[in-house]
């Protein structure tokens, strides 16, 4: 990475196109191969001894540059006519090369900003997706309203390329990227749809994740700009300028957005108690003030997506609810603010009176129904939550079968230890435990009772419930750690970088 840094600094100092030449460097594709989501796309059964060739990649790029992307052919084939090889195969290789090259300048920029902020040591904890929940526990108990927002897609591919061009000045590289994207959509759908986006994300995962995250980052940067500047804008001059290159200039070309709605309310628009969190395609906006301001932000989001990103967004994709009456779903948890009421008897001189105290607490619980649905989809139980055997694992040894189930239980327990109530988590463990026993009994062609009586595996299967407690007893001092505290308290692990496979936020 140091070599990339030196190369980029030299190229930028000469004001050259510094990304385009990297596309034709063979070591870039070797780097993509070593860091790829699925290495099998770089192996093709052919006459090249299962090795990719840079010459073939260049030939495919030449072919794409000679195509007319305004003409859609119904007979377009996935076969390259002059090579006879699978066109999708080479497209995936080029996609990985694009992803590696375009990630380099942003990775260097991120690393340098982290070094300047001196937060490298704590960066690993900040990266954890569960670091969101301590923030929610600290802030959301003082808030009243929450807005669930689902970020709309698909976005037109031309908008994606333009957004990237605002940040990196390399005309040949983005021209080639545009050719690649148009070539993909010409073979699937000229206008991006959810189906074509899903196809692109599966065949080109790394490039898709980068483009999608950059699209979200761009909309959030505009949102944060307006959030910070909204209270300083005057009544008659409030407007939104949807041009990233000259963000603070050309006031005569500012595009006024819902100025009618703001004509009498802008002086009260400042809201210091508004908080925003996001994970993947879902974000949450919470505020302490009246829902009127939340509706203003709702209309702002809709206009932003429609005017700047040309993405159609309907108002029903943004829901505003009271925190005390509504549970919002995030990262596989259901969260809501619970009101705890208590009565205190107070005495002043000879007068005695009762005082009602209302305290708020953020409840974060395990959603049992979606988890059972995920377990049923994975064939661990039926739709009612009754455990069933896993016949496809019956060919493995007893130790491997038990280890597989234990690994799933360990991961779920690790992920859901922040729950306020552990009862749902214990039910999931119980389902997996019985599914493991039934799988072993099915393998040995016996009943569950006969298998347990003959093999004495009951003590071994107790690890489903005791292993997590033993680990925590090693982390915390024994005088402070008790079984009662384990069942009652929430424990957030800050080493979780992605959601569990069984977590479903839909």
Curated annotation (Swiss-Prot):
Cellular component, GO, one term: chloroplast
Pfam families: Intron_maturas2 (PF01348), MatK_N (PF01824)
One example of a Gene Ontology biological process annotation: tRNA processing
Places the protein is found: Plastid, Chloroplast
Keywords on record: Chloroplast, mRNA processing, Plastid, RNA-binding, tRNA processing
Transmembrane segments: none
Taxonomy, superkingdom: Eukaryota
Cited InterPro entries: Domain_X, Maturase_MatK, Maturase_MatK_N
Record HAMAP family: MatK
Cited function: Usually encoded in the trnK tRNA gene intron. Probably assists in splicing its own and other chloroplast group II introns.
Family: Belongs to the intron maturase 2 family. MatK subfamily.
Protein name, entry field: Maturase K
Source organism of this protein record: Trifolium hybridum (Alsike clover)
């Amino acid at each position: 990475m140091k070599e990339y840094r030196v190369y980029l600094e030299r190229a930028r100092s000469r004001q050259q196109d510094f990304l385009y030449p990297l596309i034709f460097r063979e070591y870039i594709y070797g780097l993509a191969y070593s860091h790829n989501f699925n290495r099998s796309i770089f192996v093709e059964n052919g006459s090249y001894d299962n090795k990719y060739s840079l010459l073939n990649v260049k030939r495919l790029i030449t072919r794409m540059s000679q195509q007319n992307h305004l003409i859609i052919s119904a007979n377009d084939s996935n076969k390259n006519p002059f090579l006879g090889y699978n066109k999708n195969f080479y497209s995936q290789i080029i996609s990985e090369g694009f992803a590696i090259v375009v990630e380099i300048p942003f990775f260097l920029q991120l690393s340098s900003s982290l070094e300047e902020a001196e937060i490298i040591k704590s960066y690993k904890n900040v990266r954890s997706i569960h670091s969101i929940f301590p923030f929610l526990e600290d802030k959301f108990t003082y808030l009243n309203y929450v807005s669930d927002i689902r970020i709309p897609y698909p976005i037109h591919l031309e908008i994606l390329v333009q957004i990237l061009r605002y940040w990196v000045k390399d005309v040949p590289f983005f021209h080639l990227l545009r050719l690649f994207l148009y070539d993909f959509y010409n073979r699937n759908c000229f206008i991006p749809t959810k189906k074509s986006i899903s196809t692109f994300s599966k065949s080109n995962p790394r490039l898709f994740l980068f483009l999608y995250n950059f699209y979200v980052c761009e909309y959030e940067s505009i949102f944060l700009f307006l959030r910070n500047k909204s209270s300083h804008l005057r009544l008659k001059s409030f407007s939104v300028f949807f041009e990233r290159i000259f963000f603070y200039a050309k006031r005569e070309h500012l595009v006024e957005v819902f100025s009618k709605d703001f004509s009498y309310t802008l002086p009260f628009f400042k809201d210091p108690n508004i908080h925003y969190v996001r994970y993947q395609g879902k974000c949450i906006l919470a505020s302490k003030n009246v829902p009127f301001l939340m509706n203003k932000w709702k209309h702002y989001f809709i206009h932003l997506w429609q005017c700047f990103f040309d993405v159609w967004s309907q108002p029903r994709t943004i829901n505003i609810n009271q925190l005390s009456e509504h549970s919002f779903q995030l990262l596989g948890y259901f969260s809501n603010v619970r009101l705890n009421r208590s009565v205190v008897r107070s005495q002043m001189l000879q007068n005695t009176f009762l005082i009602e105290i209302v305290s708020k607490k953020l409840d974060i619980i395990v959603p049992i129904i979606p988890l059972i649905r995920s377990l049923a989809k994975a064939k661990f139980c039926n739709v009612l939550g009754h455990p069933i055997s896993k016949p496809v694992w019956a060919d493995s040894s007893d130790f491997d079968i038990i280890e597989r189930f234990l690994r799933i239980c360990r991961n779920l327990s690790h992920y859901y230890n922040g729950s306020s109530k552990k009862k749902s988590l214990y039910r999931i463990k119980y389902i997996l435990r019985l599914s493991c026993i039934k799988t072993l009994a099915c393998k040995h062609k016996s009943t569950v009772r006969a298998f347990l009586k003959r093999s004495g595996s009951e003590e071994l299967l107790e690890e489903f419930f005791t292993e997590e407690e033993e680990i925590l007893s090693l982390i915390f001092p024994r005088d402070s750690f008790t079984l009662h505290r384990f069942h009652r308290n929430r424990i957030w692990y800050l080493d979780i970088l992605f959601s569990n496979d069984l977590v479903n936020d839909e």
